[in-house]
Amino acid sequence: FQTGGWENTKKGVYQIKDTFINFWFKFVFPHMSDLYLLKPHEFYDRYIAPELGTYLKRYFRNVCMEYMMLLNQMGRMPFPVHKIGTWVGKTGNIDIIAQSTDRRNIVGLCNWDQPQLTSQMCEELYQNMEKAKIRSEHIFLFSATRFEPMLAEHAKTDDRFELIDMNEL
């Protein structure tokens, strides 16, 4: 993205794109010997269950991006989006940045594992936007759990915010 915040950006992030291969190398391959010794539910309880929530966090962000892309295809975004991705900084991240051809931005914050998406998390998003030198008139807040009541009330009166929970996804 053409954000201007290069001094705060990490050089690059490499990830295995194929979800099956990623799962295999994260959970199965490192414990192959135990795979043959343990019963399936024992293997799952020992090696997969404790880390599954953290592992799925990344994929929740992907689902949120896909949701925004679908809204874009249906013409339901605040403006047409040309590209979508993430910003990874040295001291913080922006989960989703959707950008138009004239470089207007929509940012997204994805909450997978916290009990609720809070105004403090939004404040951290604003700080990361400053580091990335990104301005946005619209903010999409995604939560797998719930939203802080004060934040939900604020979003009802401020049309810059769009709150999306698991039921909408």
Show where each model-derived region lies.
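Accessory nucleic acid-recognition modules appended to NTPase machines
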Residues: 1-91
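Domain-level recognition of nuclease-like catalytic cores that cleave nucleotide substrates
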Residues: 140-169
